[in-house]
Swiss-Prot record:
Pfam families: 7tm_6
Membrane topology: Multi-pass membrane protein
Any single biological process term in GO: sensory perception of smell
Name of the protein in question: Odorant receptor Or1
The gene coding this protein: OR1
GO molecular function list: odorant binding; olfactory receptor activity
Length: 417
């Protein structure tokens, strides 16, 4: 993939390439073990990843937690909690990501399977749109995070007394030593950068895979609409995998026994079943971490707004809170948006069937089509959480924002009293 002025030219047959920026970040952060190497090399890499996380994430979060021993009022709590909640949630998300890394790598390999290759001209558009969506999603979150970091690092310069970018407690006094202050300032800056990179690299893995699933659903819709119509022959694929060969063998058998049209309906049924299975796997891998992010975002957004509305807020603090708020709301909105898109696209299958030339179907093919239609009538919702289920859609996003504002109003009333 050639990158020219942030204008990538995608290869629709290499859909994994849309994650190249995420994989680059995860590789250097110790969260993407080499896939084609011996176990000893993987173990050394895993140890490297643990060392980074302990130094710049776990200890970093511990210094923020210890800050609570000096809090005096609600403003101090908000000042400490809005970043600490992000760190605690991130630690949980990364351990879940690290635990499921083999399954995540398998999902990215599955993304490049022959079944998901576009076969007709109309099928290229949804695949390429999904790839662009994954890339620009990463770019957007990365740039917003960069601006947030810049504001946080600059904000201490606007204060009369010496302070660090993030509220934290250290066993040394940095107020009277330039060297100690410089070392701690650098440590926090590295921690902020790494935490932000961890966040947008792992979160966009889930949303990116879901965008690709949505693109494949749209692809399936175009296949359904062409049933019964005269279409050009499928593009011949030079390289195919074992899964595709086995599926083609089954489809060719149906074509010889029951006819070409019945075989095409069978292909749509098998494709639909595979997409749903892939979606269930992605959902099962990430449901715990996404649920934690959604729940924590209510408190984080509330505390960020409370800090931004304080009396002694500088312009740099206000801009930092604004960009941080944009990052947090964007994370949750993206999760809810991709879930909403998948539900919306799957609900349109009845419409797709209506565009097919079903008048040409024989009795057996019509029965197969009815069976397929019954399969697609089942509602598809992306849900996260184990005991308490949260459906990812735009309604959920609005509820999160309303809940955050309600908590903010309660805290502001307590502060005024």
């Amino acid at each position: 993939m050639k990158l020219n002025k942030l204008n990538p030219r995608w290869d629709a047959y290499d859909r994994r390439d849309s994650f190249w920026l995420q994989l680059l970040c995860l590789k250097y952060l110790g969260l993407w073990p080499p896939e084609d190497t011996d176990q000893a090399t993987r173990n050394r890499y895993i140890a490297y990843g643990w060392a980074l996380r302990i130094m710049f994430l776990h200890l970093y979060a511990l210094t923020q937690a210890l800050y609570f021993k000096d809090v005096k009022d609600i403003n101090d709590i908000a000042n400490a909690l809005f970043v600490l909640m992000t760190q605690v949630t991130l630690i949980y998300k990364l351990e879940k990501f690290n635990y499921n890394i083999a399954r995540i790598q398998a999902c990215l390999r599955k993304l490049n399977c022959t079944l998901y290759h576009p076969k007709q001209r109309e099928e290229f558009s949804p695949v390429l749109q999904s790839m662009s969506g994954v890339f620009w999603l990463m770019i957007f979150l990365m740039f917003v995070a960069i601006f947030t970091i810049i504001m946080w690092v600059m904000s201490p310069a606007f204060d009369n007394e010496r302070r660090l970018p993030v509220p934290a407690w250290f066993p040394v006094d940095y107020h009277h030593s330039d060297i100690v202050y410089g070392v701690l300032f650098l440590y926090q800056t590295i921690g902020i950068v790494m935490s932000a990179t961890y966040n947008f690299s792992t979160d966009t893995m889930f949303s990116g895979l879901m965008l690709h699933i949505n693109g494949q659903i749209v692809r399936l819709g175009s296949m359904v609409k062409k049933l019964g119509h005269d279409v050009p022959p499928e593009r011949q694929l030079v390289a195919t995998d074992a899964e595709w060969k086995e599926m083609r063998k089954r489809i060719d058998h149906h074509s010889k026994v029951y006819g070409t049209m019945y075989a095409k309906v069978t292909e749509c049924v098998l494709f639909h079943k595979d997409i749903l299975s892939f979606g269930d796997e992605v959902q099962d891998i990430f449901q715990g971490s996404i649920f934690a992010q959604v729940c924590a975002s209510v408190i984080i957004i509330c505390m960020t707004l409370l800090q931004a509305t304080g009396d002694d807020v500088t312009m740099a603090d206000l801009l930092g809170c604004g960009f941080y708020l944009l990052v947090m709301t964007s994370q949750v909105f993206i999760f809810c948006y991709v879930g909403n898109e998948i539900s919306y696209t799957t609900d349109k299958f009845t419409e797709f069937v209506g565009f097919s030339n079903y008048f040409k179907f024989d009795k057996r093919t019509s029965q197969a089509m009815i069976f397929f239609l019954q399969m697609t009538l089942k509602d598809v919702h992306i849900k996260v959480g184990s005991v308490l289920k949260v459906t990812l859609n735009l309604h959920t996003f609005l509820q999160i924002m309303k809940l955050s504002y309600s908590y903010l109003a309660v805290l502001q009333s307590m502060e005024s009293e």
